[in-house]
């Protein structure tokens, strides 16, 4: 067959950042103006951790661009009634009409005051997966900055059901919004549910493959054999939600069955709170004058403040102390005369002694011999005393790490898990040292692009922390947002990301019903709600109830790609030009999420590879128009000049590419200025590159020292200690929060307050789910199985479920066609592979095909991704189940940080019919 040769073929460099495993570099092949292929960008092979490769999701972007189900013009709702069974009656309108509608609503809202009568913002916004929508929303963050207070309380699950507790405790302990292994140098990794071969993108897959070739060992501890488990040296099928017991037993082996000098004694003594003396009231013994914590000086045989010059602190022991004080909640000072002072390390050893492998075996269903062997392998691999040289600096080499996955590091039990994981690193000196357990980035602290700069001296020799106030004068008795993050969760702070990481389920739940004795203002709805790249009607819990709440919102504006289950309730759909059709610059490199540890840092351009389909518009163009029509143009431009577009300020000490605050600026003018400013800053004034340069080259980076991967050298340079093992500050803060709540007759958060402890204790974590069943009026014996959710590389963030190519590829990976179930358990229920089954919790049911496997515990079911769609084209026809449909939103199952977990007790039964190809 004769074909006409193309008139033009281009390869356009851009990036994919559709999930937190990005950014990945790629090129788009464009033939005669049509995108035909996505390819790796091998020009980035030397600077990108995945050598210029992208993951499977990026290959669906061509089909996403030309999806016949796309919304191609603004749409207005004509049916005033909202609900799943109400046809919205969307009709196409012009951009002028759409933008005027939004602008008038915003101006009316602003005229009433940006805060409503209860003191919370009238404008709310919800964005999806892990901050990644910001990589596609152009200058919209600058508009939000210009507006003022925004309520981000209404989450879509990406906070509280993500790796939530790790975010909060990780940043508190070692500036680690997320935590990863230093895979490039690690020899032994214990992974508790961290499914990095699915959720870590090509960067993690590449690095772990290289590590296996190098000979490292990964032990995967989880109830089912995930993709990561299948790629590991060993799979340990642990009982769901018993991970703290397993890790406590590992610590027992190290602390009780080995000698103290087999640990990293210098690290424990000099970089942690281990030598601090604890008094009989469980608080630090302090110098009566300076109030600094005391240590026992082995050189002078007396207690002295921890920072005394030339001090030689005792790591362990008990000592007679006189003339000290302790400081409790609300600055209550107690005199401590003739008391015993015990080092925090000795308190730890005594605390952990009861948690033997034999004790843990009965709880987590892992043989004691296996627990003991894994602990001993970990200690041997730690190579305590070894060093390595990085950029001329000699550092400890501790090639062991412990990493946690979703539902291990969030919800009840997560505090204990995060503490134990971090302590396992501390004991061998592997925290923030080469080969060990590392933090990736910061979001609750600033600056976001360099976690080292967030390390500043604070009280008691630790890093400065920015907790929400719990003292009587400053505690936020009146919530500043609908999820009450500032009122209930001190550790989350009050920076830009804090609200989205508060207990967002409370914002949804309290719209329906407040807890008994809440003694809080009646929750209000926002006047306007913006949503983008988020679908809480599918991605949160108890979704059928959530839909009813969404339907009550008075005015919802959705930046929309297709109709979905959330924007089905919207009043206005604004179609943005998507991934391959619009322009934006972002930061790349440094250290960022998952395993994105780079040896470079810089910026990358997402550019218009093809013309926008229909009447869709660049997000920056939409934002410009909103700013102009709402009278916020000057404030908006000033926000862009400050760097609110997400890269660099447009004016610095030696450069000025500022926009005229009073003028209107086309998207390409804005991004040209950003390109120039970013390259000037990165090159320290040596180069200034414009938008046209980036359209050709795609990215610009400069080398970065690998020393920036590791926080311990920064801690040492500033003479700071990690706030481990003893959690005295959290204990005091928790007591202070209890005082405030009880003064205001609020007892409904008491169970969460129980989590504030100096040394975490095991409590019956799985039993909390049984208790919740009983309290809901159900019988525990009726729901004998655990249902878990697991990540899928093909559907990592869930935003691409409407792309047929993803379905086609996913069918090659087991589990993407239904509910993974143990084959012997299935036989007991008379269920064969491919049978249609009902999975029911005490609040509802979800349906799908049985996918039988041996690599899953008999008491466990697993569903990949999040489905059960009923509005989104293509996805609604997949007949796929979802845990979210049947997992309750529950105050009872919310921990002290405000998080829950993707886990629910269920029953299962066979339905009529067989679903062909279910095992694919």
What are these regions (language model features)?
Residues 95-122, 179-188, 351, 374-401, ...:
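Glycine-rich phosphate/diphosphate-binding loops that line cofactor/substrate pockets in enzymes
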């Amino acid at each position: 067959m004769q074909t006409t040769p193309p008139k033009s073929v281009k390869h356009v460099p851009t990036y994919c950042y559709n999930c937190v495993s990005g950014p990945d570099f790629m090129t788009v092949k464009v033939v005669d103006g049509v995108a035909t292929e996505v390819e790796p960008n091998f020009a980035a092979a030397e600077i990108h951790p995945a050598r210029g490769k992208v993951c499977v999701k990026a290959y669906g972007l061509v089909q996403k661009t030309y999806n016949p189900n796309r919304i191609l013009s603004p749409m207005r709702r004509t049916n005033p009634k909202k609900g799943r069974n109400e046809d919205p009656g969307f009709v196409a309108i012009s951009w002028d009409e759409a933008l005027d509608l939004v602008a008038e609503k915003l101006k009316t809202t602003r005229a009433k005051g940006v805060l409503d009568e209860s003191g919370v913002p009238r404008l709310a916004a919800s964005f999806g997966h892990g901050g990644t929508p910001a990589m596609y929303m152009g200058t919209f963050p600058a508009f939000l900055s210009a507006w003022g207070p925004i309520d981000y309380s209404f989450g879509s699950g990406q906070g509280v059901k993500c790796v939530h507790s790790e975010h909060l405790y990780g940043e508190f302990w070692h500036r680690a919004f997320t935590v990863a292994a230093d895979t490039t140098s690690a020899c032994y990794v214990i992974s508790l549910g961290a499914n990095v071969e699915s959720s870590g993108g090509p960067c993690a897959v590449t690095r772990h493959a290289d590590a296996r070739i190098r000979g490292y060992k990964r032990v995967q501890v989880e109830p089912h054999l995930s993709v990561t488990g299948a790629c590991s040296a060993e799979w340990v099928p642990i009982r769901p939600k018993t991970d703290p017991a397993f890790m406590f037993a590992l610590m027992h082996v190290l602390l009780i069955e080995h000698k103290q000098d087999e640990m990293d004694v210098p690290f424990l003594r000099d970089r942690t709170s281990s030598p601090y003396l604890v008094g009989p009231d469980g608080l630090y013994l302090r110098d009566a004058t300076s109030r600094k914590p005391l240590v026992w000086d082995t050189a002078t045989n007396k207690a002295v403040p921890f920072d005394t010059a030339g001090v030689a602190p005792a790591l362990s022991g008990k000592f007679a102390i006189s003339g000290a004080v302790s400081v409790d909640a609300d600055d209550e000072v107690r005199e401590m005369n003739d008391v015993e002072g015990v080092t925090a390390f000795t308190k730890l050893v005594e605390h952990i002694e009861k948690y033997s492998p034999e004790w843990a075996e009965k709880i987590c269903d892992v043989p004691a011999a296996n627990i003991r062997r894994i602990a001993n392998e970990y200690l041997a691999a730690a190579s305590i005393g070894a060093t390595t040289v990085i950029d001329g600096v000699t550092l400890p080499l501790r090639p062991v790490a412990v990493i946690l996955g979703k539902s291990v590091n969030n919800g009840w039990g997560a505090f204990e898990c995060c503490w134990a994981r971090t302590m396992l690193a501390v004991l061998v000196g592997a925290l923030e040292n080469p080969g060990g357990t590392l933090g990736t980035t910061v979001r609750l602290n600033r600056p976001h692009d360099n976690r080292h700069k967030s390390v500043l001296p604070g009280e008691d020799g630790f890093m400065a922390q920015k907790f929400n106030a719990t003292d009587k004068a400053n505690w936020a008795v009146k919530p500043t947002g609908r999820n009450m993050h500032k009122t209930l969760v001190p550790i989350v702070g009050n920076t830009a990301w804090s609200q989205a990481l508060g207990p967002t389920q409370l914002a949804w739940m309290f719209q329906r019903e407040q807890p008994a004795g809440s003694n809080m203002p009646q929750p209000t709805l926002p006047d306007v709600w913006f949503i983008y790249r988020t679908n809480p009607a599918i991605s949160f819990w108890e979704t059928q109830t959530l839909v009813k709440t969404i339907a009550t919102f008075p005015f919802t504006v959705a930046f929309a790609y297709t109709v979905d289950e959330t924007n089905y309730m919207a009043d206005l759909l604004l179609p943005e030009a998507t991934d391959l059709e619009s322009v934006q610059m972002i930061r790349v490199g440094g250290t960022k999420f998952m395993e994105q540890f780079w040896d470079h840092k810089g910026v990358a351009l997402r550019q218009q590879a093809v013309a926008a389909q229909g009447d869709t518009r660049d997000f920056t163009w939409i934002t410009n128009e909103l700013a102009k029509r709402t009278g916020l143009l000057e404030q908006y431009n000033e926000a862009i000049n400050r760097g609110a577009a997400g890269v660099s300020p447009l004016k610095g000490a030696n450069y000025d590419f500022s926009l005229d605050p009073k003028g209107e600026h086309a998207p390409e003018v804005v991004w040209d200025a950003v390109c120039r400013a970013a390259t000037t800053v990165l090159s320290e004034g040596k180069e200034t590159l414009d938008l046209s340069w980036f359209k050709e080259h795609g990215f610009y980076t400069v080398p970065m020292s690998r020393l920036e991967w590791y926080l311990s050298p920064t801690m040492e340079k500033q003479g700071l200690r990690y706030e481990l093992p003893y959690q005295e500050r959290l204990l005091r803060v928790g007591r202070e929060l209890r005082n405030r709540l009880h003064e205001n007759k609020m007892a409904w958060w008491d169970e969460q307050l129980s989590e504030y402890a100096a040394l975490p204790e095991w409590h019956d974590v799985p039993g909390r789910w049984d208790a919740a069943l009983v309290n809901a009026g159900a019988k525990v014996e009726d729901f004998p199985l655990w249902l878990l959710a697991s990540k899928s590389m093909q559907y990592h963030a869930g935003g691409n479920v409407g792309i047929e190519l993803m379905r086609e590829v996913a069918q090659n990976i087991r589990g993407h066609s239904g509910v993974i179930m143990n084959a012997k358990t299935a036989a007991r229920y008379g269920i064969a592979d491919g049978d249609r089954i009902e999975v029911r919790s005490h609040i509802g049911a979800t349906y799908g095909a049985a996918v039988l496997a041996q690599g899953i515990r008999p008491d466990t079911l697993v569903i990949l991704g999040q489905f059960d769609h009923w509005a989104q084209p293509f996805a609604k026809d997949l007949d796929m189940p979802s845990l979210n449909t049947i997992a309750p939103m529950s105050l009872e199952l919310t921990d002290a940080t405000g998080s829950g977990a993707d886990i629910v007790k269920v029953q299962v039964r066979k339905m009529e019919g067989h679903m062909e190809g279910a095992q694919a």
